[in-house]
């Protein structure tokens, strides 16, 4: 396994399964193509290219002709990834194709935003259409609880990540759900599973930090139908929320790539989506899936942060203790988990030092002021 990553050392680079890390910090798309070709030559043979974020999936699909000379690619058509990764385009396609989704609006000016907020009420959801173009560290989705907050966000709607989308908030009482699957060239699902999101981070609008593989034939059939209407090929990660008002599974997000929690869906034979991608791309048969319903996954550090804010801490402890899969901890590959711990400790020490320094400065300032 080779990884093309940014300049900062990531905990995953410590993995015993990683052959080599290749720094990738391109100036533009042309530069990225050049760097990927250099990586291909270093590897020495055609390797399977597996994007792990929306930007990579869109780039790989739209430059498939150039990349296919050096890499083996999954089957997405060039237009599909952008049309589902772009949340504004996804919403328009859902409306046109009759796919249930949350009511969404695209205000341009504060007056339009106020009218939308009057219709949707509070809280509502604000999200950026093209989150892969956001500055590092900026949240792509958040709950809006007041007009002033919406107006501040609206100021950035003309930026590359825009437009800003204001969306009806569907309460999670009927369940937060997701579906991961792989669809072949003919649109047939070779492997897939429905997951229940038990804990998200940030709460209500964030990604899965505690999830479970569940038997939900209704959602699986719905996800297959959604994929067929959208023309999905290859791997996909879809987020749904069941609407308590009408019982629909509303599609909230569609990522044309491996989902971060794909290892949740490791079946009783050890088959997961990464292996399915490799088998399909190499022309080999994909075995019949053997679902492992009840299998759970936890993202350690963010789950613990969420647990500290929960009134039911004991239930969180039990879920953590009984998890089958973790984002970082693996008994056969401990180095990434250790590296993550070191990074967390370093950040904590840095915060403590800065806090102590700030307190000392305030104390000196108060002493000087008192002396005068």
Annotate each language-model stretch with its function:
Residues 81-165, 170, 185-188, 217, ...:
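Active-site nucleotide/adenylate-binding loops and adjacent lid/helix of ATP-dependent enzymes
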Residues 276-372:
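Peripheral (often C-terminal) accessory segments that flank ATP-dependent C-N-forming ligase machineries
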Residues 145-204, 214-226, 241-245, 249-250:
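Phosphate-binding site of ATP-dependent enzymes
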Residues 165, 233-237, 287-293:
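Flexible, glycine/charged-enriched surface loops at secondary-structure junctions
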Residues 198-202, 206-210, 255-270:
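Glycine-rich phosphate/pyrophosphate-binding beta-alpha loops
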Residues 228-263:
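Conserved metal-phosphate-binding beta-hairpin within the catalytic cores
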Residues 1-76, 111-114, 342-372:
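ATP-binding N-terminal substructure of ATP-dependent carboxylate-amine bond-forming enzymes
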